[in-house]
């Protein structure tokens, strides 16, 4: 039997392969040990903190008249530098993580009580908070540690760094439609960056707002985070007049403008997460049943009360009826023939909002649905046809389970109609033609653009979530949360052991020549000296 002789290259390859495998295993073990040890340390500190908080008297629910005083207290807490070090921030994030994890079911039940939303979506909202907090904990060092950058010749033998600096006391104003996600994720981001936080939650999601305020009082030291949930407009007015260092607002464009004006008067930054009339554009090349199902699903989440929901849809004229029928069948498949009896279909938040939905339906050509029960805040999933750009349903964001279907012949028609409500928070395209998708990208300015699905881009922490102009200012989620709640600060470390006289007066012809040569040579950088 002839022996097989390995060549030198085979031997080297095998050695390299085995070495890489061993190194990978060691790295995995190292990361696991680091996480376990770090988690154990945070857990120990959390238990100590919990014991301290248990001995404290429960705080009285915050009243809007107290906001000015609380803002002052939180600013004083920030000035002590208690959250200056990353370890202190990790401890607070772990407290927040445990708060949500330990009370996951209670928070889910409160959301369901407020919004009549299906159980799965309530749990998914709480899980999204847990995942985001874990992302922040895991990447705190990566994104917030001081980083060295190259140094220019003028700083010869010095060192240059960029560090992320917190703003101070952050005011987070959250809405009712996703009361856990849209309040706790911004709070987690602000705390991760070293800020103290005042959280103004919505009175319309009273069960969730009250529970989260009570849990924050129990789990998070009051010098870092305080909540208010009892009032609406009065509290927002107080927030605008208080001396916060940063505003983070999610809600309507009208209130967003008030927040932005207040921030501008104080010369402090603001992030505004607003909304808009998000279009969907369906192309003939797509699987129509799949596209219709995904649009119907988006329109059904929280009964259409989500800022990234499909607001209206553009469909080629030749397939309009087929598309409408497919959307109708999807609604029936999701919630049955009588959607009012479904435990999974949500309710409109207030009677006045349900009344507004009825006015839209009454002035439209209904293809399917149209039932409204104002007393029970129920609006049936509804499809509108023969829609014109000046109809009531196209005046402003619908924020409900009503889907206007607009026929088109060319994409240029679509682009002209979208210009009536520019810069939507999201634009959804359904096509198998990549050239068509790129054409839409080039012609519609939006916070996000997604082909062949909707909304689920929010689950990706590697993508920014935010609008543009009318749909918002700024973004967050994942690494972008660190960018939002902290600012880059230049840090330069020089010395006196060597003095470069080229910059001193009187300025000689030699200095002019030397400086000119340095500029002309295009080598102004000295890396990491």
Curated annotation (Swiss-Prot):
Keywords: NAD, Oxidoreductase. GO terms for molecular function: aldehyde dehydrogenase (NAD+) activity. NAD(+) binds at residues 251-256. It catalyses: an aldehyde + NAD(+) + H2O = a carboxylate + NADH + 2 H(+). Its EC number is 1.2.1.3. One of its GO terms (cellular component) is cytoplasm. CDD domains: ALDH_F3-13-14_CALDH-like. SUPFAM superfamilies: ALDH-like (SSF53720). The lineage of its organism: Eukaryota, Amoebozoa, Evosea, Archamoebae, Mastigamoebida. Belongs to the aldehyde dehydrogenase family. This is Aldehyde dehydrogenase 1. It holds the Pfam family Aldedh. It comes from the Eukaryota.
């Amino acid at each position: 039997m002839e022996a097989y002789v390995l060549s030198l290259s085979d031997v080297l390859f095998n050695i390299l392969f085995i070495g890489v495998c061993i190194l990978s295993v060691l790295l995995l073990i190292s990361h696991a040990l680091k996480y376990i040890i770090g988690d154990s340390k945070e857990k120990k500190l959390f238990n100590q903190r919990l014991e301290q908080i248990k001995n404290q008297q429960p705080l009285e629910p915050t009243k809007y008249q107290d906001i000015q005083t609380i803002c002052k207290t939180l600013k004083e807490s920030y000035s002590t530098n208690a959250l200056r070090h990353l370890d202190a921030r990790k401890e607070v994030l772990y407290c927040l993580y445990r708060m949500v994890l330990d009370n996951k079911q209670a928070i889910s039940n409160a959301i369901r009580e407020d919004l009549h939303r299906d159980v799965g979506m309530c749990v998914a909202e709480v899980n999204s908070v847990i995942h985001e907090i874990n992302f922040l904990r895991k990447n705190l060092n990566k994104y917030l540690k001081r980083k060295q950058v190259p140094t220019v010749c003028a700083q010869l033998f010095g060192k240059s760094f960029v560090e992320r600096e917190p703003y101070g006391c952050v005011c987070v104003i959250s809405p009712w439609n996703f009361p856990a996600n849209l309040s706790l994720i911004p709070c987690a981001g602000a705390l991760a960056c070293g800020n103290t936080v005042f959280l103004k939650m919505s009175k319309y999601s009273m069960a969730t707002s009250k529970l989260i305020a009570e849990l924050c009082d129990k789990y998070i030291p009051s010098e870092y985070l305080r909540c208010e949930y009892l009032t609406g407009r009065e509290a927002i007015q107080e927030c605008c007049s208080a001396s916060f260092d940063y505003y983070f607002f999610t809600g309507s464009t009208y209130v967003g403008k008030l927040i932005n004006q207040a921030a501008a008067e104080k010369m402090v930054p603001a992030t505004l997460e607003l909304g808009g009339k998000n279009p969907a554009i369906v192309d003939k090349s797509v699987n129509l049943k799949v596209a219709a199902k995904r649009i119907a699903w988006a329109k059904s989440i929280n009964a259409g009360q989500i800022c990234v929901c499909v607001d209206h849809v553009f469909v080629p004229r030749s397939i309009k009826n087929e598309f409408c029928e497919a959307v109708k069948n999807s609604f029936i498949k999701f919630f049955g023939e009588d959607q009012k009896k479904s435990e999974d279909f949500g309710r409109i938040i207030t009677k006045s909002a349900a009344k507004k939905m009825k006015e839209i339906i009454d002035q439209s050509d209904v293809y399917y649905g149209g039932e409204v029960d104002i007393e029970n805040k129920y609006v049936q999933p509804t499809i509108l046809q023969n829609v014109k750009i000046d109809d009531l349903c196209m005046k402003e964001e619908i924020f409900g389970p009503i889907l206007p279907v607009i026929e088109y012949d060319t994409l240029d028609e679509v682009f002209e109609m979208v210009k009536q409500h520019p810069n939507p928070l999201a634009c959804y395209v359904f096509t198998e033609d990549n050239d068509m998708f790129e054409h839409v990208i080039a012609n519609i300015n939006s916070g996000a653009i997604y082909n062949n699905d909707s909304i689920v881009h929010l689950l990706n922490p590697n993508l920014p979530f935010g609008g543009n102009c009318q749909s918002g200012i700024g973004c967050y989620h994942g690494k972008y949360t660190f960018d939002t709640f902290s600012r880059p600060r230049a840090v330069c470390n020089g010395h006196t052991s060597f003095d470069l006289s080229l910059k001193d007066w009187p300025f000689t012809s030699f200095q002019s020549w030397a400086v000119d040569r340095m500029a002309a040579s295009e080598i102004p950088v000295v890396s990491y000296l």
